[in-house]
């Protein structure tokens, strides 16, 4: 024990230095100064000698002894400045922090005098106790003296009390030297415990831990402890579940160290110590914690272990680090232990469990956020695969990764099922990797709980959606069909309306004509009536005159009766009187013809008049037939009916009376008929036969044309037409190629090469041969004589070695020798007589693909059997069919059918089909007609619908108006200002006008304008549904297709009309093609009308939007609209993406600011617990840390997303850093970026670095 005055110098000097005063400045020792000195000595001795009890314990008795203390009276005599000095020394000795000292300093000077007086009285009472505490150096000496067992335990208990009760200055005196002694003893006890375990060893270890706790209950002690090399490791080694109380204290101390604000990463130092201890003991580093959490241990130990786990995980800033630690604990069995801990009813346990769960959930959401960042930054398949491959390469995970890929190859290659497989696999992988509570799954457990019910429900819903989409597609097709039918009906209705209007016009014209004729007839009638009246008057006058003449004649006749009788024969007869039956009155002029060419009946003739019949034609009773055209088939005139010598006159018209011939004039005789010709029978002989009649043999048919049809049978009773006499017919030309031309003379004395005919076809060398014209007189090939090497054995070897057939030839058997071999019948290679080898080969290949008898192929063509005939079959048949001349030549070889090659046999059979090639072309057109209609009709409907949609779309019109408004505003003051409209093609050029910052175009501006102010305009792409289809329609090709269809229909119709009469009952060509032509013509007329309507609408659209339809084709116009439609939709998406990016940048900036603010708050909260950098020696630090750990205040903080991170472990940091960099570049003013956020690598850089490390 030191004397009371011995510590004046050091203690006083220390405090004087802290307050900026030297010892010389203190009052002198004489007079009152002696009393003052005694007071200061008491303060100093108090710091050296302390009782074992706490200073506060003496405060209870201070009031009772205060009046008896002579020091109080002496304290009243010193100045206020000296009181303040003593007061500051008292505050320092009381181990109060600055926050608690400030209210005391604000007290009045009187209160401060009382406080100092009470404190001095308390210190005096402690000094008067019989037992005074030992000094720090004495403890150090005792610890170094090698105490063991009970003596060591007693010393450690006394040391613990001293460390708890003495001020910080005492702890500082104990300092690093005393701490080293404690750690040496603790290490020795740990090492000895592994060999032998004494009764006091565990108690001594626990007591040392308690001493360390007391030593670290201030900043000096914590700093000193952290400066040691093995201090944390020894605390970790003290976590022994066999000594629960010691493990509890050790775990609490380690937990407090983990949450210290300075130095950083204290949790990592504790983890390193735990790892080193695990390597020493050859166990898992978290195994002691798991052992302490298991059942059978105390609740306090479980709380302490879980508290240390939270302290290890929570301070870490890196997401990967937290997930890694948590997953390692789960793999050791923490998952099962947690279920037991949740059943414990303890408040401290609930606090720690709550902290663990909250931190795990937050990490889970952070991990999901990292997945979003990966999706944004790493979207290249090859790059992602390469990174994963380099990650697992040459590791234990490599075969498992390969197995995963191999299993993926087994996914069923089904269009519908494959996406469902991958969705299920993705969900499983997501739940495995992004496991709840931010941990890895329990790999020891065979049963892994994966929630796929929700995914299956989604798949079921997706299947329903897909079915609905399929149904919608089907309905869309039906809608297109209905639209097509509607357009067809519209065209038909328009045609009917036009026809009706035309008929109305025709009827109105006829009515007008009839009215005009009626008026003319009425006028004529009036004229005739007037004329009749006039003539009646004249007749009456003439009748009167006649009567007068008769009377006069009668009177004269009475006078000259005799002379009149004698000369009556010479007097000419009087002219017939009016009204006599023999009077012939010329008929009135015929009336004008009625509309339609109908001649109205003439007015009736007066009674007794007659019209003589027209004279017969000269020569004749019969009209000779017209002469036959040259080259046409001779068709004899029909024979006369039996018993009829001449053509009878036509019968009278119905209702008409026969007009008798006029009677002969009085006194005239009938005109006799003309006498017959000499030797005639009264009927003129028929004219001589014209050229081409029966007697002259017909000319041979044209090449490729059909033969002459047989003559019709004779009428009954008429003689048959004799066949042409022999020799009168024109012989057919000789077959092609059968002429034997003279052999050309070869140059240089060359002779024609011998033509070989091997028994079987050999493999042919593919050389480039020289002909005689390629050679020169001095070249090698003009002198060769290869014939000298010719022999049968050589040819047999060639046949054996290079035969194109696979079967063993007879030549091989002949070569092997053997006189008793049997002759093998070989199929002769039939020579081609008409066709060339290439044509015959192609035809044989074609016929081999059908495997049908030739006659059946012929019958199918004759019957036009569409069930067998296909488009490709007819096309190949037309392509491979021999020419008509060749078919004609083959038809003449019918007698040699069996000796012909197969291809020529087919030609013989097909040559009997009349007009084969036109027939095949017509059949091909019939098979293709429906496809042509289905190709043309949708194109017409698309253009028609697109024209109608453009005219009816109000939203598109609004967009054009907005564009016109914006354009006129932007062109203000230029030559383009004040426009009334613009060309539609300008819409595609909107994106060429860019903004001042080059970040958007005029098109983007219009799209954003529509989004914000006119959202209904955004619907115009849906209203122009047929513009895309119309953009693929070429009006020129459409017109050509219609013209081609019209021409083909006309050709087929002409072929049907000119087709000869069928000679085979199976020939249904004319019958089927006639009905087809009729239907095809109707379909064509409908298409033509639809096309005409389309052109009309497009022309009207040109007038509507002011463009020339002749210069701007349908395809170009709708292609511009289609491109603009796509560009507008793309601009809308880009605007949305740009807004999302700006929003992300804004949120990222806010998140960064918030995270930085929370980091500072966290730092402040930690510093509130303990400020390691502040001046002064604050006590009770460890108690505050342990209290914060126990209540959860050290963990609970408002923590935003961990995207803002100083480390590179969090993927989102890269996105925020890049976005903030862009945002800062765009900001008008400078923005200070914290240095901690600089240099943060992006996730792509991390991946590339990982690839580099792996490779």
UniProtKB/Swiss-Prot annotation:
The entry's keywords: Acetylation, Actin-binding, Cell membrane, Cell projection, Coiled coil, Cytoplasm, Cytoskeleton, Hearing, Membrane, Nucleus, Phosphoprotein, Repeat
Coiled coil: 460-562, 1027-1179
Domain DAD residue range list: 1177-1205
Domain (GBD/FH3): residue spans on this chain: 75-440
Entries under InterPro entries matching the protein: ARM-like, ARM-type_fold, DAD_dom, DIA_GBD_sf, Drf_DAD, FH2_Formin, FH2_Formin_sf, FH3_dom
SUPFAM superfamilies: ARM repeat (SSF48371), Formin homology 2 domain (FH2 domain) (SSF101447)
Compartment(s): Cell membrane; Cell projection, Ruffle membrane; Cytoplasm, Cytoskeleton; Cytoplasm, Cytoskeleton, Microtubule organizing center, Centrosome
GO annotation, cellular component aspect: brush border; centrosome; cytoplasm; neuron projection; nucleus; presynapse; ruffle membrane; spindle
Positions carrying Phosphothreonine: 751
Function: Actin nucleation and elongation factor required for the assembly of F-actin structures, such as actin cables and stress fibers. Binds to the barbed end of the actin filament and slows down actin polymerization and depolymerization. Required for cytokinesis, and transcriptional activation of the serum response factor. DFR proteins couple Rho and Src tyrosine kinase during signaling and the regulation of actin dynamics. Functions as a scaffold protein for MAPRE1 and APC to stabilize microtubules and promote cell migration. Has neurite outgrowth promoting activity.
UniProt remark on domains: The DAD domain regulates activation via by an autoinhibitory interaction with the GBD/FH3 domain. This autoinhibition is released upon competitive binding of an activated GTPase. The release of DAD allows the FH2 domain to then nucleate and elongate nonbranched actin filaments.
Designated name of the protein: Protein diaphanous homolog 1
